[in-house]
Every structure is written in C-alpha cells, then in structure tokens.
Amino acid sequence: MVKLRLKRVGKKFHAQYKIVAADARSPRDGKFIEELGHYDPHAKKLTLNKELLTKYLDQGAKPTDTVRTLLKQEQFYSNYIASKK
C-alpha cells in the first residue's frame, strides 16, 4: 500500500520535510517512490506538486494524518474530495 507521508531532512534542530509517496512498510527516512513537495515548519512554507498528488490519490494512496492536515491548509484536499463527488 502506498502512503503519502513526510520524510525528515535538514539539520539537527531545524527539521524540514519532503512530502513523498512511499510504501507503507518502508522506514520514515528510507526508500520512497516519488517526491511530491516539501514543507518547512519554521518558515511555514509548503510547496506541492498538485499534478503528482492528484495522480497518487487517484491511484488509491492514503495520506497520513499530518499530510492530510497540510493538504487541508492549502485547500487542496477539500477541493480534491469535492471534485470526486
């Protein structure tokens, strides 16, 4: 099963995260399928590749709770769900 989740990168005490599509069994910072965006919690900056996100969500990938919250803040997830109805 494919999950959309955060992969930690950056320096110690200054974490940044990549939003990736990864197998649910792989470790947090391990192998991933594709990078879909990145998030800097210190600068509150979120960058998304909306075409790739839509592709993986259409194929059945499940976002983790944190990624779902970030997508809702960008109004991406609610727009995606509304377009599916």
Curated annotation (Swiss-Prot):
The keyword Ribosomal protein applies. It holds the Pfam family Ribosomal_S16. GO terms for cellular component: cytoplasm; small ribosomal subunit. GO terms for molecular function: structural constituent of ribosome. GO terms for biological process: translation. SUPFAM superfamilies: Ribosomal protein S16. PROSITE patterns: RIBOSOMAL_S16. Keywords: Ribonucleoprotein, Ribosomal protein. InterPro entries: Ribosomal_bS16 (IPR000307), Ribosomal_bS16_CS (IPR020592), Ribosomal_bS16_dom_sf (IPR023803). Transmembrane segments: none annotated. Belongs to the bacterial ribosomal protein bS16 family. NCBIfam families: S16. This is Small ribosomal subunit protein bS16. It comes from Metamycoplasma arthritidis (strain 158L3-1) (Mycoplasma arthritidis). The gene is rpsP.
